[in-house]
Every structure is written in C-alpha cells, then in structure tokens.
Amino acid sequence: MMGSGLHIAARRTVLLFGVLLGMLAVASMVGTKTAYASTFTVNSTGDKGDQDTNNLVCNSTPLQPGIDPECTLRAAIEQANDNDNEATTVDTIKFSLGGDGVQTISPNTGLPVVFEPVNIDGYTQPGASENTLAVGDNAVLLIRLDGKAAGFASGLNIAADDSTVRGLSVTRFSFSGGIGLSGADNCKIEGNFLGTSPRGTTAGLGNGFGLYLQNHFANPSDSPLANTIGGASPEARNVISGNSTGITFFGGLENKVEGNYIGTTKSGIDDLGNSARGMEVLAETRDVSIGGTGAARNTIAFNGQDGVGIPSADSTGSSIMSNSIFSNGGLGIDLGASGRTANDPDDADTGSNNLQNFPVLSSATTSSRSTTIKGTLNSTPDTIFTLRFYSNPSSIPDEGKKFLGLKSVHTDATSGEVSFTFRPGKKVAVGQRITATAAELDSNTSEFSNPRRIVAQQ
C-alpha cells in the first residue's frame, strides 16, 4: 500500500508539475504577446472599421469559417493601434488587393490617427515596385489613397514614433494634408507621390499640404524630432507636387528633407508646381536639414510662391544645402517678410535663420580653361561660413538651379568681412548667372545672392 500511495503521489506531483508548466507557458504567451510585431494585410478597398480590435485579426466583416476575413485600411490601422504591442515594436500594414492596375481607397471620413508604431508599405501590393533611377522616378505605385469624400481630414496622421509610410499615392485631401506627422519622432516618409496620381504627372489632385509636421495635438510641447522626408537613395524619393503647399513645418527639431521632387512631375524636370510655397518652415521650427550631397539634394521648382520660405522669426538653424531650386514664383529662399532681405553690417539683426547675410558677388568670368567667381561676405565677426555656388540660365537668373560647389571662409574678427575667390570644377558658360548662399558651417542658410552674369575673361 505504501508503494502504491507513493506511486499515486508521484503521479500527482508529475501531473501538478505539468499543469504548472502549462499555466506558465500560457502566462508566458500572454505576457510576451507585446514582444511580437503584427502584420495586417489590406485586401479590401472598403472603409468599414474592425469588428473586434482585441483578437489580433483584421476583420472588417464578421468572421466566417473557411473564408479569409475582409481587411480594410481603416480596420488595419485600428488593429495596429489596439493590439497592445510595446512602443518599441513596429507593426506592418501590407496590401494585397485583387484586380489589375491602381487600387483606390476612398475613406468617407478621416482614418484613425496612428498611435502605435507601424510600417505602412504600399510597395507590398503585387506588381508595385520602387524607383531605381538616379534622375527621374520609375516607381510603380498601385495604391492610391484619395480624400475626395473624407471631408476635413488628412490622408494619414502619424502620431507614433518609428513609423514609416512608403509606396502610396495620396490625393485630394484638400482641406488638410496628404500625410501629417504629429509629435512623432524618427519616422520615414519615402517613395510616395503626394498630390498627384500614381502616374506622377497628373495635376488637379492636390492636397492642402502635401506633407505637414506639427507638435502633438494632445501635448503641444511634444515636437516632431529627427524625421526623414525622402532620403539619399533613389527608392526613398518622394514626389510632392500639385498641392497648395508642398511641405509645411508647424514645429519640430532636426528633421531632414532629402532627395525629393517638390513641384515637378516624376521626371524631376517638368512643371507640376505646388500653388503656394514648395516648402515653408514656421512656428518655432529649428534645425531643418534641406538637401545635402549627391542624391540627398532636392529639386524644388515651379511652385507659385517661394521655393523655401522661412517667415517665422523664431525658426532658426535650418540648412538649405546644394539643392536645385529654380522657376519658383517668389524667391528661391526667402527669410522673414516676403521679398529679399537686405544685408546689414556684421549681420547684427535677428529673425528667421538669424536673417543671415548673403554673399555679394563682384565678378564672374570664364576663360578657355576655367571659371572664376569673386566676391565678399560681411557677417558675424570671427566666424567660419560655408559658401555654396550655383549657376542659372539667363531666363531664371536669381535662384540656384545647378550646384557648382562650396568654399569655407572665415570672417575678420573686427570687421566681419572676408573676400573670396571660387573656381568650380567645371567651367561655366558665358551668359549663365551665378548666385551664392552663406551658412554658419551648415546652419542658418541665407537667401540667394544677387546674380552675377558670367562674362568672357579678357
């Protein structure tokens, strides 16, 4: 009997241990659900919301055995918002919509604000592909988000850090913006057409803002930080054209705008201008980086007003580097009040980008072998500045169409004056107009200088 009792006790112990292990396993599964990213695949262009945001299944219609659930973009965003993932875990929204060609999603009201990190990837739609061209854009976009029926709403409003939106055409959110970032940090907006159809050439489909960045609507002290619009590789290029304004910063710190076409068709050459500014930096926005080297340079052209406008006195530190800026209705770069801001002695004034003084070009000559550009800069004494030089055709002389190169100079400690001579790597044709900008290293870029016509060297 004792042996039998011990045997039964042992069996109970093993059984209890097994039950405990099972409970721990279940508890572990429940406790670690948040450690795994979820993927939701949009398979319907409809606009119904999710039936049950607690089941980790995107289903905008009741679940039926043996039938794949319908998943709309609205339902997918609701699931991504409510699946209890950790803030460091990024969900993915993919697309697999039946039918050939472009699939259009037309919400009847604004889509939910994105509160949890998510990667919304239009290039997952079968047949879509990223841009591979260094010049121009051959991306195949097959998902269009159209706001004609959405009322006063943005196409997508991202309020979650570490989110990405790529591969979408976003059109006709005319009362607001195509994509908004509200207090979100470290997000990427890349490979989209904002304000034009997936063809990348169609006018009349613009948003109020192609893209806007603003402080968080529930926490105004939370500014968007370190987001990248575009990027330095071909697949990251956005076409932001045909809107009222291309990109607007209503706040933010250390955001980047790189490699985009702002105001052109996807060719990067033809006119599809935004009706107002190509880009505007407002309301305590600081340290925006616009452009860069190589593929990070933006093309900003054909916009109805300024190419880049920084009117707000409390918006400082922005760098506008090596872009192609031309054929805009206003100035290529406009600081402060509308129109050219005059230089002042030692650049003692303050305001947007500190109202940085621009260089004064005294001569520009071309010989049979080279081009020589001379001039002066008067600005903050004993300070290192980066000068950037551009050439322009005579028909559009006073912006910066073709970047020629840069030069560092150091102003005199007493007078704030420095003279310079710059020779670009390739000679510039007689008749071209030269302009230049000045920046404190790579901060607080000035307006373009007055143009100087290239003449033959005697």
Residue ranges and their predicted role:
Residues 179, 189, 194, 211, ...:
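Fold-core signature of tandem repeat domains
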